[in-house]
């Protein structure tokens, strides 16, 4: 018999889902965040005035969903594709975008049902579909030349799905991969993230609760939190491992609040079911960077260690006093590590070309 989610739904509607925000972006907390920060606008996001918007493109996915893509051109013969996470947008990488413009050709896109991309159907909200979408974006806007792939959270899972589906592409063209705050084996067992040992119940109840909330979107959207300071605290708890800044918290909240309720609900089971550990071998031979915050509650460090142990030679950076939103919370460190990866990838691609390998 399926769990009776009615009491839980009522509790969420009354605001009890605030505790779920401690689960680092899992559905219940994201719903709470959406209610708290519905009034937050883009104007509250960090000021990165150096960012110059490049060419905007639309890529048609196999099922007709339109994927929003932005390209910052460069004469450097290397393309870097950035893939954002769950309930976020391509703006996740705005600091890296500002620092890396001109150093490579940069490609950013909103995953389906996120940001400015089109809404997918229920049965398309899974990690394998995101891998197919990523492959189509590469085929459409970067069909030739060496690549570096950068994925944060669910974006890292998308890269793993692509490697599972198209190992030939990885072997031929990808010279660097950065997996930031991600997991090769789902997001189960957040016992340390939820108080009072509630994570087991969360694992069982969250998907049906999320589905019920999606059906009652009007109920969720009407929810309001009057205490904005409390809302900011919750976002800090799930996003940042350090004190963080109110500006950064509002920026994360603005991305969360822009994500459709249906997408938040329907992607959660996919995050829990995700398991690409057996196909990580397809990344061998690629310069791999793995980074995670030591206080990441959604994809804790042991998930990154699991990836590194399966890929000989992978670089592992454990970032102290950091949570799940590394590209924002510790943007300088992330940018520095990515620039070093780009330099290595560029040299490797040049050596590859000089060797006459197709």
Write out the residue ranges for each language-model feature:
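N-terminal cap/lid segment of alpha/beta-hydrolase-fold proteins
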Residues: 45-67, 71
């Amino acid at each position: 018999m399926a769990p009776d989610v009615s009491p839980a739904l009522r509790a969420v509607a009354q605001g009890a889902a605030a505790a779920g925000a401690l689960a680092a972006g899992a559905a219940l907390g994201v719903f709470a965040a959406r209610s708290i920060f519905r009034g937050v606008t883009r104007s509250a996001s960090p000021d990165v005035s150096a960012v110059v918007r490049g060419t905007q493109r639309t890529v048609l996915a196999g099922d007709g969903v339109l994927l929003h893509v932005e390209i910052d051109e460069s004469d450097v013969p290397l393309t870097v594709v950035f893939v954002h996470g769950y309930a976020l947008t391509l703006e996740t990488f705005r600091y890296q975008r500002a620092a890396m413009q001109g150093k490579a050709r940069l490609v950013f896109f909103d995953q389906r049902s996120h940001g400015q991309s089109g809404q997918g159907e229920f049965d398309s909200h899974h990690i394998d579909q995101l891998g197919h979408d990523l492959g189509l974006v590469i085929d459409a806007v970067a069909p030739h030349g060496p690549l570096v792939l950068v994925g944060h959270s669910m974006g890292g899972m998308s890269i793993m799905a692509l490697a599972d589906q198209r190992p030939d592409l990885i072997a031929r063209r990808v010279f660097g991969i950065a997996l930031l705050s991600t997991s090769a084996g789902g997001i189960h067992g957040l016992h340390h993230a939820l108080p009072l040992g509630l994570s087991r119940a969360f694992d069982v109840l969250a998907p049906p609760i999320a589905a019920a909330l999606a059906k009652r979107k009007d109920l969720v959207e009407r929810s309001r939190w009057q205490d904005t300071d409390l809302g900011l605290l919750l976002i800090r708890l799930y996003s940042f491992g350090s004190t963080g800044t109110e500006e950064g918290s509002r920026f994360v909240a603005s991305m969360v609040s822009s994500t459709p309720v249906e997408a938040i609900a329907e992607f959660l089971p996919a995050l829990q079911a995700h398991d690409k550990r057996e196909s990580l071998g397809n990344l061998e031979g690629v310069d791999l960077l793995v980074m995670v915050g030591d206080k990441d509650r959604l994809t804790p460090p042991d998930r990154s260690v699991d990836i590194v142990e399966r890929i000989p030679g992978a670089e592992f950076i454990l970032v102290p006093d950091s949570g799940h939103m590394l590209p924002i919370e510790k943007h300088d460190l992330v940018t520095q590590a990515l620039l070093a990866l780009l330099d290595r990838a560029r040299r490797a691609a040049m050596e590859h070309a000089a060797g006459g390998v197709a």
